[in-house]
C-alpha cells in the first residue's frame, strides 16, 4: 500500500503542477490577447487620426481653391461650399454660368465614412468617382476644380473629363 500511496501522491502533485502551468499559460494568453487588442485599438485610433487630419487638410484646400476660382471670375462660376447639418460631410458644388456645355462639379468629403465623392453633372454626360480619404491629395482636388474652368477641354467634349488618378 505504501507504493500506491506514494504513486497517488506523486500523481496528484503532478496533476496540481499541470493545473498550475495551465492556469499560468491561460493568464499569459489572456495578457497577450489584451495586449494585441490594445495595440489594435491604438492602431485604429492612429489611422482615424490620420484620416481626420487628411479630411481637415482636404477641406481647407478645397475651400481655398474654390474661393480662388470664384474670385477670379465671379460672373462665370457659382461656388457653394459648406458642411452638412450633421457636420460629417463637407460639400463643394461648382457650376458654370452661361457656358457650353453646362457643367457642375460636386465634391463631398465624408470624414466618418472615409470617402471622397466627385460627381460631374454636365450637358455631355454625368460621371461619378469614389475614393478613400487617404487616396485623395490636395493636387487631385485642385485638378478637378481647374477642369471646371478649362474651356478648351470642354469646347469639344463628348463626355466629362476623366477623374484624376490617385498616386496610391
What are these model-derived regions, one by one?
Residues 92-143:
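Intrinsically disordered, low-complexity regulatory segments enriched in Ser/Thr/Pro
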Residues 132-168:
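Extended, charge-rich C-terminal regions with high alpha-helical propensity
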Residues 1-22:
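Short linear clamp-binding motif
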Residues 14, 18, 68, 72-75, ...:
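Surface-exposed polar/charged interaction patches
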Residues 74-91:
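Long, charged, glycine-rich C-terminal linkers/tails
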Residues 21-73:
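Contiguous, amphipathic alpha-helical segments that mediate oligomerization or scaffolding
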Amino acid at each position: 500500500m505504501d507504493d500506491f500511496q506514494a504513486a497517488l501522491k506523486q500523481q496528484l502533485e503532478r496533476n496540481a503542477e499541470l493545473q498550475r502551468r495551465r492556469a499560468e499559460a491561460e493568464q499569459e494568453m489572456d495578457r497577450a490577447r489584451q495586449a494585441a487588442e490594445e495595440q489594435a485599438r491604438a492602431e485604429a485610433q492612429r489611422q482615424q487620426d490620420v484620416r481626420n487630419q487628411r479630411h481637415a487638410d482636404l477641406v481647407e484646400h478645397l475651400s481655398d481653391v474654390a474661393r480662388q476660382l470664384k474670385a477670379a471670375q465671379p460672373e462665370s462660376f457659382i461656388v457653394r461650399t459648406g458642411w452638412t447639418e450633421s457636420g460629417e460631410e463637407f460639400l463643394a458644388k461648382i457650376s458654370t454660368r452661361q457656358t457650353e456645355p453646362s457643367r457642375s462639379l460636386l465634391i463631398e468629403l465624408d470624414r466618418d465614412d472615409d470617402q471622397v465623392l466627385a460627381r460631374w453633372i454636365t450637358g455631355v454626360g454625368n460621371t461619378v468617382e469614389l475614393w478613400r480619404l487617404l487616396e485623395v491629395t490636395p493636387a487631385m482636388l485642385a485638378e478637378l476644380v481647374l477642369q471646371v474652368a478649362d474651356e478648351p477641354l470642354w469646347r469639344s467634349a463628348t463626355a466629362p473629363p476623366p477623374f484624376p488618378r490617385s498616386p496610391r
